[in-house]
Amino acid sequence: MGVQSNISDTLSGKTILIVGGTSGIGLAAATQAKSFGAKVIVVGSDAGRAKEAAEQHGLSGWRAADVTKRTAIESALADIDHVDHLVLLAGSFVVGKVLEADVDHLRRAFEERVWAAIYTLRSLGDRLAADGSVTFISGALSDRPNAYGTAVLAAASAAMEALARGLALELAPRRVNTLSPGPIDTPLLGKALGDNRDAFVEGLRATLPLHRLGSAEEAGAAVLFLMANGWMNGATLNLDGGSRLV
């Protein structure tokens, strides 16, 4: 049986909830899952963008919520009867040095990644299928921090991976895994770097073994692999084109 056939057999007819699914990796995973016959609901912070993403790509539904607010998540998910697979990747690019940046700004790294995940899981409760899965999206900063104001973001990314491992035990027999992507060319990169994006990407490419950034579609395919592989549990999958080696 081929890989695509296995994914199709596993995901067809399933309900997939993607928190942070209106662009980039989340939207790529959503559209690919839909192509395999899944019913996909995306959650975003902006109602207009969430609605547009769902309608443009023929997804089953959308919700808008501030993921850092427990009551907002509860309200957004209240009418969803059942979820087979949950993907958690909401989070802005929170940058700022510990001794210089506003503390409330830095706190968002954990609120958007760790606490948002906890609020979502508690809101769903037993509506998350017993034979389902949860997939976190962290990032290479979790084990490759730098000196450019990413210490708190790196800590939040590492916390997501640790949380996922613990949840693989707490939520069993549900499977819980993390995808840890390296440099991926997504809208978030442009938002974070602004006018410096092109120069940064060009310099980064020269340092990478494959001389390019990964695509949202490649990362989305890895998300589907983690959903569909029934023996993958408590794992962190590094998808970085070898960038951790240099």
Question: Language-model features: where?
Answer:
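Conserved glycine-rich cofactor-binding loop
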Residues: 22-23
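Rossmann-fold cofactor-recognition segment
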Residues: 56-71
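Conserved NAD(P)H cofactor-binding loop of Rossmann-fold oxidoreductase domains
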Residues: 87-96, 241-242
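Substrate-binding pocket helix/loop in short-chain dehydrogenase/reductase
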Residues: 97-98, 105-107, 200, 204
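Catalytic loop of short-chain dehydrogenase/reductase
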Residues: 109-110, 118-119, 131-172, 183
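A glycine/serine/threonine-rich, flexible loop-to-helix segment
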Residues: 184-207
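C-terminal substrate-recognition "lid" of short-chain dehydrogenase/reductases
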Residues: 212-239, 244
